[in-house]
Curated annotation (Swiss-Prot):
InterPro entries: aa-tRNA-synth_II (IPR006195), aa-tRNA-synth_II/BPL/LPL (IPR045864), Phe-tRNA-synth_IIc_asu (IPR004529), Phe-tRNA_ligase_II_N (IPR004188), Phe_tRNA_ligase_alpha1_bac (IPR022911), Phenylalanyl-tRNA_Synthase (IPR002319), tRNA-bd_arm (IPR010978)
Catalytic activities: tRNA(Phe) + L-phenylalanine + ATP = L-phenylalanyl-tRNA(Phe) + AMP + diphosphate + H(+)
GO terms, molecular function: ATP binding; magnesium ion binding; phenylalanine-tRNA ligase activity; tRNA binding
Entry protein name: Phenylalanine--tRNA ligase alpha subunit
Gene that produces this protein: pheS
Pfam families: Phe_tRNA-synt_N, tRNA-synt_2d
Subunit-level organization: Tetramer of two alpha and two beta subunits.
Cofactor note (record): Binds 2 magnesium ions per tetramer.
Residues reported to bind Mg(2+): 252
Enzyme class, spelled out: ligase
Native source species: Pseudomonas putida (strain W619)
Entry GO CC: cytoplasm
Superkingdom of the source species: Bacteria
Classification via PROSITE patterns: AA_TRNA_LIGASE_II
Coiled-coil regions, chain positions: none
Length: 338
């Protein structure tokens, strides 16, 4: 057994001298592997008398367990040191300044639409939406727009075929609402509309908000009061407002609404072309023909409608002189509206 003790001592010394896990693995194979030195000692038990085998076998197993225990402890120490070194190398200094993130914001047109919707929902209107690809009937015919009207011309409207087109206003949403809903009706219809037009104040795609109110005993004074209060709240100013007689096929009487120029306070400037007034929207009492075609009796119900371009209002509110800036995706421009 002296040889066994010497063998164990050699193994333990080798473990202590090991410099890494690979060296430990070589020691394990040398002493505990299938052909290891302690394994070979175990194989000599067959040469001993039967009465000595249990005692010697227990000593050999104890020796193997001692070596295994020291090996595992040394291996765990190496693994812990390796993990600590890796964590130290990969650690993040949380005191370092961050890279910084650019804060986004709502697009000025989105802000304008939300501002319009907020006012009208506050006074009891609902929000209605409809398809942007519309049929000729709902876009023109049901709105009392005859076949010879200039708006039906190819140079003003995007047609897919003789019957389908990109809507030129959100009025079809009003028609569809009147067809499916009995009065009283109070809605605003925000959405994208399309027209063959592109210059400093026009875009082939723009955003429009139209409003509709249908009920008994509605008159022009109701329309006038609604529009004046909306403009006061939207621009946050006490602006002079005037209603000019105009013509729209779907309203009678019709009017254009002007406000005192927000740039010069009515004194006259380049924006208002020295007139002191700016046109902001169109409106009128819903034409009896439109009510009839939507299944509403004009003898019992009356209503008013109005429509405004969100881009036009945004230009006036924010002092933007070129509508195309809203759609150029220039972050330098858009960042001003955060």
């Amino acid at each position: 057994m002296e040889n066994l003790d010497a063998l164990v001592s050699q193994a333990l010394e080798a473990v202590e001298r090991a410099e890494d896990i690979n060296a430990l693995e070589q020691i394990r194979v040398q002493y505990l592997g299938k052909k290891g030195e302690l394994t070979q000692v175990m194989k000599t038990l067959g040469n001993l008398p039967a009465e000595e085998r249990p005692k010697v076998g227990a000593l050999i197993n104890d020796a193997k367990e001692r070596v295994t225990e020291v090996l595992n402890a040394r291996k765990a120490a190496f693994e812990e040191a390796e993990l600590s070194a890796r964590l130290a190398a990969e650690c993040i200094d949380v005191t370092l300044p961050g890279r910084g993130q650019a804060t986004g914001g709502l697009h000025p047109i989105t802000r304008t639409l939300e501002r319009i919707e907020q006012f009208f929902t506050h006074i009891g209107y609902g929000i209605a939406e409809g398809p942007e690809v519309e049929d000729d009937y709902h876009n023109f015919e049901a709105l009392n727009i005859p076949g010879h009207h200039p708006a039906r011309a190819m140079h003003d409207t995007f047609y897919f075929n003789a019957n389908m087109l990109l809507r030129t206003h959100t009025s079809p949403v009003q028609v569809r609402t009147m067809e499916s809903t009995q009065p009283p009706i109070r809605i605003v219809c925000p959405g994208r509309v399309y027209r063959c037009d592109s210059d400093i104040t026009h875009s082939p795609m723009f955003h429009q908000v139209e409003g509709l109110l249908i009920d008994r005993d509605i008159n022009f004074a109701d329309l006038k009061g609604t529009i004046e209060e909306f403009l006061r709240v939207f621009f946050e100013k006490e602006l002079a407002v005037r209603f000019r007689p105009s013509f729209f096929p779907f309203t009678e009487p019709s009017a254009e609404v002007d406000i005192q120029c927000v740039m010069c306070s009515g004194k006259g400037c380049r924006v208002c072309k020295q007139t002191g007034w700016l046109e902001v929207l169109g409106c009128g009492m819903v034409h009896p023909n439109v009510l009839r075609m939507s299944g509403i009796d004009p003898e019992e119900f009356q209503g008013f409608a109005f429509g405004m371009g969100a881009e036009r209002l945004a230009m006036l509110r924010y002092g933007v002189n070129d509508l195309r800036l809203f759609f150029d995706n220039d972050l330098r421009f858009l960042a001003q509206f955060r």
